[in-house]
């Protein structure tokens, strides 16, 4: 797997999270498989490669790849505006988080606790969803930059949906951190669009 492919997979995780957050906000529903993949990505500590973080299957990131492609193509007809805004916000929040050792320490201590809950209840159980949402609130929600989620207030005000959104945002920011760790930089999204698209299309249509 090339370095660019590794970066695209991690960035696909960011965009996948963004698409799912947008869907919960607007419809109140996402599949359990999609939720499980994103929350599960928080718990993978020793992946053999980047795709392993997302269950080892590109299909798990297909919607994220599609949203990323529309952003890189800059086609107004297909551009998913809200997911793009969320994805860019997650990249920005990750940069802020990287400077906060205290928050990283909190996350590092609480992820194993969530892992033990998963072993007891299962990944998509409401207790696990609540725990990931609370971890986001206690760490990333304290930063100056906030992600403003737009959608139907009836969906956003349901506690379980709010926890799902926060948990998925946490997973998206974990993906943003992974993207940076495998060599991703924001300038690539501006200056290397064609190269990224050339390597993204096989992932999207594979």
UniProtKB/Swiss-Prot annotation:
InterPro entries: HflD, HflD-like_sf. Keywords: Cell inner membrane, Cell membrane, Cytoplasm, Membrane. It is found in: Cytoplasm; Cell inner membrane. It comes from the Bacteria. This is High frequency lysogenization protein HflD homolog. It is a peripheral membrane protein. One of its GO terms (cellular component) is cytoplasm. Belongs to the HflD family. It holds the Pfam family DUF489. Gene3D superfamilies: HflD-like (1.10.3890.10).
């Amino acid at each position: 797997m090339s370095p660019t492919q590794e970066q695209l997979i991690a960035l696909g995780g960011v965009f996948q999270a963004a698409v799912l957050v947008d869907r919960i906000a607007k419809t109140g529903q996402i599949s359990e498989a999609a939720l499980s993949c994103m929350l599960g990505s928080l718990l993978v500590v020793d992946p053999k490669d980047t795709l392993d973080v997302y269950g080892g299957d590109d299909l798990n990131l297909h919607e994220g790849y599609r949203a990323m492609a529309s952003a890189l193509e800059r086609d107004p007809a297909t551009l998913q505006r809200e997911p793009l805004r969320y994805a860019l916000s997650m990249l920005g929040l990750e940069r802020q988080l990287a400077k906060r050792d205290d928050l990283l320490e909190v996350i590092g201590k609480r992820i194993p606790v969530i892992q033990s809950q998963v072993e007891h209840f299962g990944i998509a159980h409401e207790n696990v969803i609540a725990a990931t949402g609370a971890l986001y609130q206690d760490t990333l929600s304290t930063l100056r930059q906030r992600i403003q989620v737009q959608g139907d207030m009836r969906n956003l005000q349901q506690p379980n949906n709010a926890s799902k959104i926060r948990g998925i945002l946490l997973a998206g920011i974990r993906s943003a951190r992974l993207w940076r760790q495998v060599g991703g930089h924001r300038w690539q999204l501006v200056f290397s669009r064609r190269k990224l698209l050339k390597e993204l299309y096989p992932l999207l249509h594979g």
